């Protein structure tokens, strides 16, 4: 009952339609930007690292691609040119991310929360003709049970191009490690390492209209820093570990809590996460 007021025609564009040929919509692609709550003063660069990876992959397969950006969480209100959108990401706090008829969604690298899965269940959607590339194993399991054509795509940040090896790549970065985890690292690593926080970046120029561009640039800069300087990255962040793996950087992934176990399943078979107990 609590979801009954959400049932409307917007759901019809979730994916139950024939994808157009690229030339039919002129090679236009919509990429995610993120509009954060005004009271929040720090931002997660992992969001824009996903956008950068998506753009990089599209440019690899479509040299004439044209891009514009739209808020990930309000595609039901999308009013720009008809476009293809790669639905790489985490969905969602509410149903407003569902694309309307002007967006042609391609679901790759997609995670759906339990809340959204409940929403789909209430709607009793038939997923038998629905194709989805799942970022994690829980999303894969859900859509397999629904009879969808689901596969394990992992995260598109794993598709970033490999860096060129350089003698300047001699830094150890600790990315979003809390004090307890850092204290358990060997002394020679702690002495040499540089701490980075990519989950809570403060924006220098607070401007709600253009701040996403600053976040995007910050994400580009942090990826370049990893690529040009890192010899080792130790992190608790999926969207640090995955892009660094793609770049060819040695990575140690630390798992703060069992709640992250499914999130890190995007890297299953590629990188084993270590826990507090492993460090002790």
What role is predicted for each listed range?
Residues 1-280:
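Active-site anion-handling motifs in enzyme catalytic cores
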């Amino acid at each position: 009952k609590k979801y009954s007021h959400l049932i409307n025609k917007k759901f019809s564009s979730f994916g139950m339609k024939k994808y157009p040929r690229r030339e039919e919509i002129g090679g236009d692609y919509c990429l995610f930007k993120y509009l954060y709550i005004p009271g929040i003063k720090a931002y997660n660069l992992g969001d824009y690292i996903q956008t950068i990876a998506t753009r990089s992959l599209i440019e690899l397969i479509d040299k004439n691609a044209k891009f514009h950006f739209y808020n990930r969480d309000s595609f039901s209100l999308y009013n720009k040119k008809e476009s293809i959108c790669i639905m790489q990401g985490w969905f969602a706090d509410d149903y407003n991310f569902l694309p309307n008829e002007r967006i042609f969604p391609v679901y790759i690298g997609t995670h759906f929360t339990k809340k959204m899965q409940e929403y789909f269940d209430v709607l009793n959607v038939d997923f038998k003709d629905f194709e989805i590339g799942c970022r994690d194993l829980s999303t894969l399991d859900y859509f397999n049970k629904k009879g969808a054509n689901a596969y394990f795509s992992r995260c598109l940040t794993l598709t970033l191009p490999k860096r060129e090896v350089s003698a300047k790549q001699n830094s150890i970065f600790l990315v979003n490690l809390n004090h307890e985890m850092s204290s358990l690292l060997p002394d020679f690593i702690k002495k040499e390492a540089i701490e980075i926080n990519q989950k809570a970046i403060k924006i220098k120029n607070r401007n709600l209209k253009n701040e996403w561009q600053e976040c995007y640039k910050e994400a580009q800069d942090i990826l370049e820093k990893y690529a040009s300087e890192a010899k080792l990255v130790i992190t608790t962040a999926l969207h640090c570990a995955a892009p660094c793996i793609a770049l060819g950087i040695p990575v140690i992934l630390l798992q703060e809590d069992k709640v992250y176990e499914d999130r890190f399943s995007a890297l299953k078979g590629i990188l084993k996460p270590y826990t507090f107990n492993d460090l002790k």
